[in-house]
Amino acid sequence: MKITHHYKSLLSAIISVALFYSAAPHADILDGGEIQFNGFVTDDAPKWTWQISSPDQTWAVDTADARTENGQLVFDLSDKGPLPFLEGYLYEVAERGGPGFTPFITFSSNGRPFAVKEGSDTSVQRFRASVPVRDPETGNVSGQLSFTLNQGMAVSTGKQEEGASTPSGMSLVSGQSVTDVQSGSLPQGLKNRLSALLLMNKGFGNGMSAVDNGQVITQGVLADGRVMNLAAAYASAVSDFELRLPAEGTPARWQAGLNVTVTVQ
C-alpha cells in the first residue's frame, strides 16, 4: 500500500489480480491472485489525514468452488473480507467547528462511478456495487467484481460553552459525507475502528470519550462555529466479494480498480 501526496484531495486504490492456470492437465486452479492497493492523497488546507488501510492481498481461486451462471464462473469470495478501505481523522482536535472539516467522498472505477446494485447511491452507510474486471493484456472487460461497502463518520466533543449542546461519547454523523445513517446497522468492527481513529486526533481529551453512545447527529456539527473541542473520524470497509469471469476463455490475468476522491470543504 502506497500513499502519495498531491495538490488535490485524491485517493485511489487499484486491485490488480493475476490468475494463473496450473500446468497439470484438466487443472481447475487459478492460483496467485494478488491485490495491490495504491493511495494518492492531498489537501489544500489539510485538517484531515487520509489513508487506504489494507495491505496488498494474495488470493487464489479454484474453479471447483465456482458455480456456472449464464456462461460465467461465479466465485464467492466473502471469506476475503472485510478489508479496511478509506480511513481518515483530524490531525488534531479542532478548537471550533467551521470550514475545512467536511469531506465529500466519491467512488469510481476507471473514471466511471460504481454500478450501485443495492442502496440509493455511494453516499449511504451501506451499499453494494460492482466494478468491471479487465484483461490487462487487451484492456477488454472480461467480468466484474461485486462487493459491499460500509462506511461511517463519527465525532466526539469535549467541554462546551453556553449555546452549544452535544452528546457525550462517540456519535455517528449523518449529512454530506454519509447518509442514511443507522447506528444499529453499522458493523461493530467499523465502530471499533472509528473509536480508535478518534483517539488519533492529537489533543484528544478534555472531557472527550470515544465510547459509542448509539446516537446519530447532524454532520452540521463539523461546520458549527459554536461547537468547541471537536474530534472527528471516518472509516470504511469492503466485504462480501463476488467475482464473475467467463467460463470459456477465462483470462490468465484480470484487473479491477477502486478509486475514491476526497474533497474537503
From Swiss-Prot:
Job of this protein: K88 minor fimbrial subunit, plays an essential role in the biogenesis of the K88 fimbriae. Fimbriae (also called pili), are polar filaments radiating from the surface of the bacterium to a length of 0.5-1.5 micrometers and numbering 100-300 per cell. They enable bacteria to colonize the epithelium of specific host organs.
Segment forming the signal sequence: 1-24
The UniProt record lists the keyword Cell cycle: no
Subcellular compartments: Fimbrium
Keywords: Fimbrium, Plasmid, Signal
Full protein name: K88 minor fimbrial subunit FaeH
Similarity annotation: Belongs to the fimbrial K88 protein family.
GO cellular component labels: pilus
Keyword DNA damage recorded: no
Major localization class: other
InterPro entries: Fimbrial_K88_FaeH
Any single GO BP term: cell adhesion
